[in-house]
């Protein structure tokens, strides 16, 4: 998967799309490119990888923040892995009656650049009623405390949803939900 992600980045025409992904302001969410990314293989850049005029400050391979959001359907390598019977069995084993793949991403943790991703719940961004969104995270390289591994709050999935990322006209906005006791 890592080799395939590197190949996709190498083949990506960075001149065609220079959308910066930022977990801080979510300004990327207003772009048509982001809004259509659910049905595509789309590339998003790190904030520090481009200057104010959109020129690259880093090598293309070190400028990518993430690739998303339909790798599982549109790329044969990711599709073979994502649609593997083991994932379906795992999903059913944790109680999913009808597991569906809705989104896939490669999140690149670039050295020395990259914004902090605040604590969040995946259902903030992929909401279902009832709340049944479950994310599977696969490390494509060693993840340690020193290099910024993902953290999880034990039992956090039982605490109730705190925020939702919802459509707002042509873009998106974050709303805070009622406090959960």
List PLM regions with ranges:
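Non-heme Fe(II)-dependent double-stranded beta-helix
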Residues: 1-117
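Short alpha-helical linear motifs
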Residues: 21-27, 129-130, 176-177
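Short, conserved beta-strand element in jelly-roll/cupin
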Residues: 91, 95, 120, 126-145
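Catalytic-core "active-site belt" of small-molecule-metabolizing enzymes
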Residues: 100, 119, 125, 132, ...
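Short, structured patches in soluble enzyme cores that scaffold and shape functional sites
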Residues: 103-105, 110, 121-123, 138-142, ...
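Short, function-defining helix-loop hinge/capping sites that tune catalysis or transport
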Residues: 111, 128-130, 162
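Double-stranded beta-helix
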Residues: 143-181
């Amino acid at each position: 998967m890592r080799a395939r992600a590197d190949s996709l980045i190498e083949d990506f025409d960075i001149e065609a799309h220079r959308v910066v992904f930022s977990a801080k302001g979510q300004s990327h969410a207003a772009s048509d490119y982001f809004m259509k990314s659910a049905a595509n293989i789309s590339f998003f850049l790190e904030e520090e990888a481009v200057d104010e005029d959109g020129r690259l400050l880093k090598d293309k391979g070190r400028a990518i923040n993430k690739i998303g959001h339909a790798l599982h359907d549109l790329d044969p390598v990711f599709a073979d892995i994502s649609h593997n019977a083991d994932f379906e069995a795992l999903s059913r084993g944790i109680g999913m009656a009808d597991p569906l793949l809705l989104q896939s991403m490669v999140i690149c943790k670039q050295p020395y650049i990259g914004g902090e991703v605040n604590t969040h719940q995946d259902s903030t961004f992929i909401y279902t009623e009832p709340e049944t969104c479950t994310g599977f995270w696969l490390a494509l390289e060693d993840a340690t405390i020193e290099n910024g591994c993902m953290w999880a709050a034990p039992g956090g999935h039982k605490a109730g949803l705190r925020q939702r990322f919802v459509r707002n006209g042509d873009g998106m906005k974050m709303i805070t939900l009622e406090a959960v006791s």
